[in-house]
């Protein structure tokens, strides 16, 4: 049996770090644009940092949307969400920013994002934001 040795260097960017750094939300054409349906995505490992203390904040994100012409590619949303890991950002801002970025690329008929942050210091925070596409007159 051959032994494999893996060496790492602290100053070399890892491929996962590069993917996260370059992450962008990617969409593809909705395979059923004439049918209204909901997509539910759960992201249980969201992290960012408190802008005041620097402590990590952990949350489960629940994204529900009704696609119009585009659907978001799942790996891209995973990498995009992971890009917040080292950012110092308040719960309210990060929840709104994620929904704004999602809407900008996917242009859904409807989207709702719920960010359920783990309790810290006996405080449990849940932020919910929504978007509804305006109808053309």
Swiss-Prot record:
It is found in: Cytoplasm. Keywords: Cytoplasm, NADP, Oxidoreductase, Queuosine biosynthesis. It is an enzyme of class 1 (oxidoreductase). Its main location: cytoplasm. GO terms for molecular function: preQ1 synthase activity. Belongs to the GTP cyclohydrolase I family. QueF type 1 subfamily. It catalyses: 7-aminomethyl-7-carbaguanine + 2 NADP(+) = 7-cyano-7-deazaguanine + 2 NADPH + 3 H(+). Substrate binds at residues 72-74, 91-92. GO terms for biological process: queuosine biosynthetic process; tRNA modification. The gene is queF. Its EC number is 1.7.1.13. InterPro entries: GTP-CH-I_C/QueF, NADPH_dep_7-cyano-7-deazaG_red, QueF, QueF_type1. GO terms for cellular component: cytosol. PANTHER family: NADPH-DEPENDENT 7-CYANO-7-DEAZAGUANINE REDUCTASE. Gene3D superfamilies: 3.30.1130.10. This is NADPH-dependent 7-cyano-7-deazaguanine reductase. The active site is at residues 50, 57. Pathway: tRNA modification; tRNA-queuosine biosynthesis. Catalyzes the NADPH-dependent reduction of 7-cyano-7-deazaguanine (preQ0) to 7-aminomethyl-7-deazaguanine (preQ1).
């Amino acid at each position: 049996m051959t032994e494999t040795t893996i060496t790492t260097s602290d100053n070399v960017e890892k491929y996962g770090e590069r993917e996260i750094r370059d992450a962008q939300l990617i969409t593809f054409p909705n395979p059923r644009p004439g049918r209204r349906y909901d997509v539910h995505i759960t992201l249980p490992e969201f992290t960012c940092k408190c802008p005041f203390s620097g402590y990590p904040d952990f949350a489960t994100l629940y994204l529900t949307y009704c696609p119009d012409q585009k659907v978001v590619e799942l790996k891209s949303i995973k990498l995009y969400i992971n890009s917040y890991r080292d950012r110092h950002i308040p719960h309210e801002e990060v929840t709104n920013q994620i929904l704004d970025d999602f809407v900008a690329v996917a242009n859904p008929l409807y989207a709702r994002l719920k960010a359920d942050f783990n309790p810290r210091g006996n405080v449990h925070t849940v932020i919910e934001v929504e978007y509804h596409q305006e109808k053309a007159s």
